[in-house]
């Protein structure tokens, strides 16, 4: 049988869990604490309202990934944020986009991936920002 100390030691060295320390650094740099209006988190921000909580998620992607797979990056933009909201016990009610692309064709592929995922997950895209460079 594996001892509790061995399990704890394995968790303490897990690179995925160690990466969560980045949240503390980000919150510190932004001056966010547990007393801030929104609760800093990993999957999404939790903002209290009169009916419970609003969950807000956002994801960024590496430029190399977007350049190599623009349609899939668009799909993942929806899927990852949907997953993050679900991970916190919520239900996604809408999406916004922030797309910077080198040209209209690349942007179209990203937006097509987002649109198809939006329909597949039944989450409407309600706004956002697009910029071609």
Model-derived regions: residue spans:
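Extreme N-terminal cap/leader segments of soluble proteins
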Residues: 1-68, 88, 97, 108, ...
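Short glycine-rich or small-residue beta-strand-to-loop segments that form or flank ligand, phosphate
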Residues: 95-102
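Short glycine/threonine-rich loop-to-helix capping motif typified by GTGT followed
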Residues: 102-111
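Alpha-helical scaffold segments that flank or form the walls of functional sites
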Residues: 72-88
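Short, intrinsically disordered, charge-balanced linker/junction segments flanking boundaries
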Residues: 131-133
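Amphipathic alpha-helical segments in well-structured domains
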Residues: 78, 111-114
């Amino acid at each position: 049988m594996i001892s509790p100390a061995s399990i704890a030691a394995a968790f303490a060295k897990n690179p995925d869990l160690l990466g969560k320390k980045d949240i503390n650094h980000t919150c510190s740099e932004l001056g966010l604490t547990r007393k801030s209006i929104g609760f800093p988190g990993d999957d999404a921000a939790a903002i209290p309202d009169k009916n419970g909580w609003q969950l807000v998620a956002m994801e960024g992607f590496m430029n190399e990934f977007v350049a190599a797979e623009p349609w899939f990056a668009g799909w993942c933009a929806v899927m990852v944020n949907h997953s993050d909201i679900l991970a916190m016990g919520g239900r996604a009610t809408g999406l916004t986009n922030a797309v910077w692309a080198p040209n209209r064709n690349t942007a179209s592929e990203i937006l097509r991936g987002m649109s198809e995922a939006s329909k597949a997950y039944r989450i409407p895209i309600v706004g956002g920002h697009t910029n071609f460079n």
